[in-house]
């Protein structure tokens, strides 16, 4: 089974927050919402891939992982 983990680091240095999803589509929807919140230009956020997510967010701000669990 795969678990999709999206995390967001806090700018104040406190612990990061995590969101876990069992479905890839739900994780992508969350990633899309995070991107839309950060940008005023909606036309760039129409279809989000994992590469888009990683390209748009600095690694110190957000991260995304796919975990394999049994």
Predicted regions and their residues:
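Short aromatic-glycine-(Arg/Gly/Cys) micro-motifs in beta-strand/loop hairpins
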Residues: 1-17, 43
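Broad hydrophobic/π-residue packing in well-ordered secondary structure
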Residues: 2-4, 21, 30, 67
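Intrinsic disorder/low-structure terminal segments
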Residues: 10, 17-20, 52, 62
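Short, flexible N-terminal segments of the mature chain
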Residues: 17-38
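Short, mixed-charge low-complexity intrinsically disordered segments
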Residues: 33-70
